[in-house]
C-alpha cells in the first residue's frame, strides 16, 4: 500500500543541501518545485540528479530504509526515476531550442528514462 502523500521537495539536487558546521542535519533550500506527493519521489529525484547508477541507487534506498524495504517501494522509486528522467530530458531539449545547452545532462536524463522505465515495468509485473 502506498504511503500517505506528504510535503516533498522534488528538487533534491545536492546543491540544495546546506551543511553547517556544528549542526547535525543539513538545511534543505530552494523549495520552488515543492508539492504534496509520494515521499519516495525525493529519493528518486536525488538519485537521478546525482547521476547514480543502479548500485548507488540501491545503496541510497537501503540507507533511507535501514529496517528494509519491499518490492513495491523499489518499483515506485524506479517509476519516479523513469518519469523524472523523461521530464528533465524534455526540459533539456526545450532549453536547447532556446540556446541553453546542458552537455551530458540531457543524455543522462534520457538514459534514466529508458533504463528505469524497463526496470520499473518488470518490477510492477512481478508484484
Where are these regions (language model features)?
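ATP/Mg2+ or Mg2+-diphosphate-binding catalytic cores
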Residues: 90-127
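Generic anion/oxyanion-binding catalytic loop in active/binding sites
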Residues: 2, 32, 46-49, 78
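Juxtamembrane loop-transmembrane helix junctions in multi-pass integral membrane proteins
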Residues: 69-75
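Start-of-helix signal in alpha-solenoid helical-repeat scaffolds, especially tetratricopeptide repeats
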Residues: 75, 79-83
